[in-house]
């Protein structure tokens, strides 16, 4: 029997997996791959959309994190993934919030003991033995402190998983990617949005709000979702109802700031470790598994 491809995605908060990599996850689960998602916090500091669940917010009942476990569970189900996997266990590290967010009763993820956090992720990597790990770039995408720390922890864990500093059998990850936004495709998708795609009160994004995109020449891979994966991404986003609203046509969504974001059917990556596979005329891989060989399934 041929070995099953295995991919591991590491994200900061519930909804990050759907916003940035949802179509990719759905694409590979539909193809039969073993896809797992690690979430590093419960997302307790998220801003709640609407009045229905407003009392769960951090400055009220402070129950949002527990509620979002259910949202993440539903979103992962839409993407074809099993139960949530929280780094260190659900609630081990608290959502750090944006800069200036006051400290709460629980230890923030950005204050986590690095060896403990890295060791927890090394254990997951050595158990799953993924062919591909996906994390964030050094800026954490748009700069959220937890995203930046996910980059630090994931980078260290990928390196440590192949060495002997933690318990378990070492596993050298063949390919390690950053999930990134590509500027040109994002801008094209924004320009393609129409008033019919937006809900009342939404605004269009400005160039000043999205300065963290990557130029084409800095992209290494793209996963173009088919209709099934794109629909799964939309459904997963809708499952995060305290954080995301999907527009009437399903072509856009918005967070609590009511800025319309196109729901992209292509997701982009930078390869930071490992050998690239075949590239297209743009110089991009079109498969994160490109260049990997899958023989007989290994015995455990």
From Swiss-Prot:
GO terms for biological process: mycothiol biosynthetic process. The keyword Zinc applies. Its cofactor is Zn(2+). One of its GO terms (molecular function) is N-acetylglucosaminylinositol deacetylase activity. Keywords: Hydrolase, Metal-binding, Zinc. Pfam families: PIG-L (PF02585). SUPFAM superfamilies: LmbE-like. Binds 1 zinc ion per subunit. It is an enzyme of class 3 (hydrolase). It catalyses: 1D-myo-inositol 2-acetamido-2-deoxy-alpha-D-glucopyranoside + H2O = 1D-myo-inositol 2-amino-2-deoxy-alpha-D-glucopyranoside + acetate. InterPro entries: GlcNAc_PI_deacetylase-related (IPR003737), LmbE-like_dom_sf (IPR024078), Mycothiol_biosynthesis_MshB (IPR017810). Gene3D superfamilies: LmbE-like (3.40.50.10320). Zn(2+) binds at residues 13, 16, 147. It comes from the Bacteria. Its EC number is 3.5.1.103. Belongs to the MshB deacetylase family. Catalyzes the deacetylation of 1D-myo-inositol 2-acetamido-2-deoxy-alpha-D-glucopyranoside (GlcNAc-Ins) in the mycothiol biosynthesis pathway. This is 1D-myo-inositol 2-acetamido-2-deoxy-alpha-D-glucopyranoside deacetylase. It comes from Mycolicibacterium paratuberculosis (strain ATCC BAA-968 / K-10) (Mycobacterium paratuberculosis).
């Amino acid at each position: 029997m041929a070995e099953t491809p295995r991919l591991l995605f590491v994200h900061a908060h519930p909804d990050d997996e759907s916003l940035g990599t949802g179509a990719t996850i759905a694409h590979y689960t539909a193809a039969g791959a073993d896809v797992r998602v690690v979430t590093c916090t419960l997302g307790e500091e998220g801003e709640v959309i609407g009045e229905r669940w407003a009392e769960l917010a951090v400055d009220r009942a402070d129950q949002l994190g527990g509620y979002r476990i259910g949202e993440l569970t539903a979103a992962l189900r839409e993407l074809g993934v099993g139960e949530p996997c929280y780094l260190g266990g659900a609630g081990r590290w608290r959502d750090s919030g944006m800069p200036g967010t006051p400290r709460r009763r629980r230890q923030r993820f950005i204050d986590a003991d690095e060896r403990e956090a890295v060791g927890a992720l090394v254990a997951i990597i050595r158990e799953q033995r993924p062919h591909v790990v996906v994390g964030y770039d050094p800026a954490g995408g748009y700069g959220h402190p937890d995203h930046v720390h996910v980059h630090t922890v994931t980078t260290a864990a990928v390196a440590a998983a192949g060495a002997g500093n933690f318990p378990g059998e070492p596993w050298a990850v063949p390919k390690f990617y950053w999930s990134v936004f590509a500027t040109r495709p994002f801008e094209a998708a924004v320009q393609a949005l129409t008033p019919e795609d937006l809900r009342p009160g939404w605004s269009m994004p400005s160039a000043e709000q999205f300065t963290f995109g990557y130029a084409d020449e800095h992209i290494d891979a793209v996963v173009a979702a088919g209709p099934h994966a794109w629909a799964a991404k939309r459904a997963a986003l809708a499952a995060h109802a305290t954080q995301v609203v999907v527009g009437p046509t399903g072509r856009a969504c918005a967070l609590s700031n009511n800025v319309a974001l196109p729901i992209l059917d292509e997701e982009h990556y930078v390869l930071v470790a490992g050998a690239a596979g075949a590239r297209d005329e743009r110089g991009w891989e079109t498969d994160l598994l490109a260049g990997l060989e899958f023989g007989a399934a290994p015995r455990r």
